[in-house]
Amino acid sequence: DRPDVMSRFTTTVIAERERYPVLLSNGNPIASSGDHENGRHWVSWEDPFPEPAYLFALVAGDLCLLQDSFVTMSGREIDLRIYVEAENREQCDHAMDSLKRSMRWDEETYGREYDLDIFMIVAVNDFNMGAMENKGLNVFNSSCVLAQQDTATDLAFQRVEAVVAHEYF
């Protein structure tokens, strides 16, 4: 992978709806199906901005969703989503707050407004690294995103904030 070789990506992800109800990739969703043949469904994604191939991401799985929004300095509403395995759903609030603070800080400090319509985080227990900063679709090991007030230490909350901010920037 060479960061000086940039491409725009348009991707259609097709999978069995029952096993993989969530189909994600970089960019903005541009089309989707109800049902495809043989119990399959599909979603098409388009990332209109050139990026190196190593920042391409694709996720298919049975994941739960925490959803919120962020209003940019120009008034655009960005859809924020965190996808996790069902048992981890109640531990994502701090990660969502950390993401919103990171977006605001980037705007206030550098005047940089997020340029897609959606920003997603996926956190799964079996991701083999800490995190990956795929544009618009950050992928994390759950240990970097999950923190709950009654079980996590201050250090765990700080780590979530630091990792979410680092991958967003």
Stretches with model-predicted labels:
Residues 1-165:
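Hydrophobic helix-coil surface modules that form long, contiguous segments used
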